A protein has these predicted regions:
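C-terminal hydrophobic helical "lid"/dimerization subdomain
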Residues: 196, 240, 244-248, 288-336
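Short, well-ordered coil/turn residues at beta-beta hairpins
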Residues: 19, 82, 234-236, 336
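Glycine-rich beta-strand-centered segment in the early N-terminal region that forms part
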Residues: 4-20, 35-91, 132-134
């Protein structure tokens, strides 16, 4: 689809895309539905997504032109774009949590044009986080998989330094979670995946152990590996099966944070919550301050990059197909 190159106004910034990560959540937009379980679906229209849409929310780029009110960025700068925009005016947005805005979600690549394009118009200069000399292809995934896992792991508090985190899923998010957890000086991770190749890749990336989530005794294996049950489960898949496994593997007082959007529904005996002191919460991407923190870790060399596979922008459909088929280890990043 051909579109005219936008002209930045106000504090807007026009960037030339240098890298755009291909995220599993793009598949939901590509297919047009989210699975709610029991045969129910949420469509793009239900979510407020209008078509046609340029996808891509993991965006790195070079600043080409800025609006007259933009003072903090200049042409030639390399940046990663924070895409999870809200109304910018409500109390939630003023707290720096635009990703949780309930007034007007404006996420790039979801509700407004994203990074699968030659040029991208960023609505305000504050969303351009300077990369310095960091590799744009390696840092583009920080805008979603990076800040998502970072924000989710922070929700566990000090327990990540005391005991291993159980990570459900060894795809791009799983590999990023391993890297982020290491940068946060965590105790380590036990990774769960049904794919043997991905389990081995997780081990190669530093997991303490990797367990087949489809094994009949998977929960017993997790309980044994954690020394009596998990205190922190990060579900990067978000399916009925992974969440049920996480609950079955949880120690009393443990907590599950759900990130993945695979879909389905949860059936849980309510008495489990108080009697087991169990915590269950969702985590939706992350905030702009958290992305800046994460980029800072990368600039210090504390956060190691995950494996990225560069493909031309023209291969976006093929990249999405490969991701849907479970053939991607690490992250596919589209480049011009």
């Amino acid at each position: 689809m051909q579109c005219p190159t936008p002209e930045p106004k106000g504090a807007e910034v026009l960037i030339r895309m240098t890298a755009a990560g291909v995220c599993h959540s793009d598949i939901h937009i590509w297919e047009g539905v989210y699975d709610l379980g029991s045969g129910n679906q949420m469509t793009l229209k239900d979510r407020g997504v209008a078509l046609p849409l340029t996808m891509g929310h993991e965006i790195s780029g070079e600043v080409v032109k800025v609006g007259p009110e933009a003072k903090a960025v200049a042409p030639g700068a390399s940046c990663v774009v924070y895409p999870w925009l809200g109304c910018g005016e409500c109390p939630t947005c003023r707290r720096g949590e635009e990703n949780l805005c309930a007034v007007k979600a404006r996420s790039m690549g979801v509700f407004m044009p994203g990074g699968y394009a030659e040029y991208v118009l960023v609505p305000h200069e504050r969303y351009c986080v300077d990369l310095g000399k960091l590799d744009p292809a390696e840092t583009a995934p920080l805008a979603c998989s990076g800040v998502t896992t970072y924000s989710a792991l922070k929700k566990f508090g000090a327990r990540i330094k005391d005991e291993p985190v159980v990570i459900m899923g060894a795809g791009g998010l799983g590999h990023m979670a391993l890297s982020v957890l290491q940068a946060m000086q965590g105790k380590g991770a036990i990774v769960i995946d049904i794919d043997a190749g991905k389990r081995q890749a997780a081990m190669d990336a530093g997991a303490l152990t990797a367990i087949d989530g489809a094994a009949p005794d998977a929960s017993q294996q997790i309980i044994k590996a954690t020394g009596g049950g998990a205190t922190a489960v990060l579900d990067l898949v978000g399916s009925a099966a992974t969440l049920a496994l996480g609950i079955a593997s949880l120690r009393k007082g443990g907590e599950i944070v759900v990130v993945g959007l695979y879909g389905g529904e949860l059936k849980l005996p309510i008495v489990y919550l108080p009697l087991r002191g169990m915590g269950l919460r969702g985590s939706y991407v992350g905030s702009l301050p958290e992305l800046k923190e994460l980029v800072g870790l990368a600039q210090k060399g504390t956060l190691r990059p995950i494996k990225v596979t560069r493909q031309e922008l023209s291969q976006a459909s093929a990249a999405l197909s490969a991701l849907k088929a479970g053939k991607v280890v690490g992250r596919i990043v589209l480049v011009p």
